[in-house]
Structure formats: structure tokens, C-alpha cells
């Protein structure tokens, strides 16, 4: 194993354009927030290493980087993902309605046992909120995935969202036999080597 970490998990952020995926990523990875974040077209990811139950976990978190506006997210984006966070905007009913479509995309392209998390972002905009917590929670419970409301602006529950996902994946990994072949669910340490050389240029 790589001495720097015990696990390397690939996480994806998906959801409608404008729901705050990039802001969530920036808040968690860099603890920064900007009102005027403009996502680039292409692939964007950031790295953050966390500790969980005495294990060091390297999280490689991918953002769609604007591709969702053109419906061009391809199967390659989902390939190899250990966890997928589906984000909607609590002030935008349509973005919540489209969650089902995003979940269908996951079922179509991602691995069968991928972990999922539903996140309602922009919880700080209480006066503009149209998607009630109880409605989203009931939906998440119905399909059996965790749910959190977050605010990238106020940093509310952002840490908890990513740590919840990391814990869910770690628990799933712990209950599975360790794969001996390449391409198994636990990413081999050597696959993580190119990451550091790219991470500084993907803001």
C-alpha cells in the first residue's frame, strides 16, 4: 500500500447546472467560497485527504465542470466511481425534480454497488426555499440513500456530506473481500501517482 494513504476513493458530483456543485467542491477541498465561480468546460477534480476510523483516505472529487448543461456527461465520467453525490438546489424545484433523471444516469453508467448521497444545497436561502426537507428526506429514504441539506456559502454540512460518503464507501469496502486483480473496487496505490501532478491546475 502507498504509505501516504490507506484508501483512494473517486467521488463524483452531479446535478443540474447552477445548483452549486463547484461551490461545494471548493468549500470542501479548499475551504473557500465565491459568488462568481464560473465552471470551465471539461474535467475538473480536486484532492483532499481525510482521516476516518484511524484510516487515511484520499478523496479524488470530480466535478462535471459545466458538461451537464449540454447533456454530454458520458459513461467514462462514471467509470470507476466509488461514490456519487447528487446535488439539487433547495430554491429550484426543477433541479429536485431532475434528481430522478440523474439517478437513472447512475443506474445506467455507474457500477452496480456505487454509493449514492442526495444533497440539497443553498440551505442558507431560507426565504427562497421551495423544496422542503421532509419531502426530500422521504424521497431519499424511499430509495435508500443518505440525505443532507448543505450550504456551500455558510459551510453548513459540507464537511459532513463528504465524510458521510467516505464512511459509506469505507464500510462497503470493509465488507468485501480485497480484490487481487487490477480494476477491483479498491484503487491500487500506483494509480494515484499522476494525481498530484494535475491537481494544481484544475481549479
From Swiss-Prot:
Q: Which UniProt keywords apply?
A: Cell membrane, GTP-binding, Lipoprotein, Membrane, Nucleotide-binding, Prenylation, Protein transport, Transport
One GO term in the molecular function aspect is: GTPase activity
Q: Where in the cell is it found?
A: Cell membrane
GO BP annotations, alphabetical order: protein transport
**Which NCBIfam families does its entry note?**
small_GTP (TIGR00231)
Task: Read off the PANTHER family from this record.
Answer: RAS-RELATED PROTEIN RAB
Q: Can you name this protein?
A: GTP-binding protein YPTC1
Amino acid at each position: 500500500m502507498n504509505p501516504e494513504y490507506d484508501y483512494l476513493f473517486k467521488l463524483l458530483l452531479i446535478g443540474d447546472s447552477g445548483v452549486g456543485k463547484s461551490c461545494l467542491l471548493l468549500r470542501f477541498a479548499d475551504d473557500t467560497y465565491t459568488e462568481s465561480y464560473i465552471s470551465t468546460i471539461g474535467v475538473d477534480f480536486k484532492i483532499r485527504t481525510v482521516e476516518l476510523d484511524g484510516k487515511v483516505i484520499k478523496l479524488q472529487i470530480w466535478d462535471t465542470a459545466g458538461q451537464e448543461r449540454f447533456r454530454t456527461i458520458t459513461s467514462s465520467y462514471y467509470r470507476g466511481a466509488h461514490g456519487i453525490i447528487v446535488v439539487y438546489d433547495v430554491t429550484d424545484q426543477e433541479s429536485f425534480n431532475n434528481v430522478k433523471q440523474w439517478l437513472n444516469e447512475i443506474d445506467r453508467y455507474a457500477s452496480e454497488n456505487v454509493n449514492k448521497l442526495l444533497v440539497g444545497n443553498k440551505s442558507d436561502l431560507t426565504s427562497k426555499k421551495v423544496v422542503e426537507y421532509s419531502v426530500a428526506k422521504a424521497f431519499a429514504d424511499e430509495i435508500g440513500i443518505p440525505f443532507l441539506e448543505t450550504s456551500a456559502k455558510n459551510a453548513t454540512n459540507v464537511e459532513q456530506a463528504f465524510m458521510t460518503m467516505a464512511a459509506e464507501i469505507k464500510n462497503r469496502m470493509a465488507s468485501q473481500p480485497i480484490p487481487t486483480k487490477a480494476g477491483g473496487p479498491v484503487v491500487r496505490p500506483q494509480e494515484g501517482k499522476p494525481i498530484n501532478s494535475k491537481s494544481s491546475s484544475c481549479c
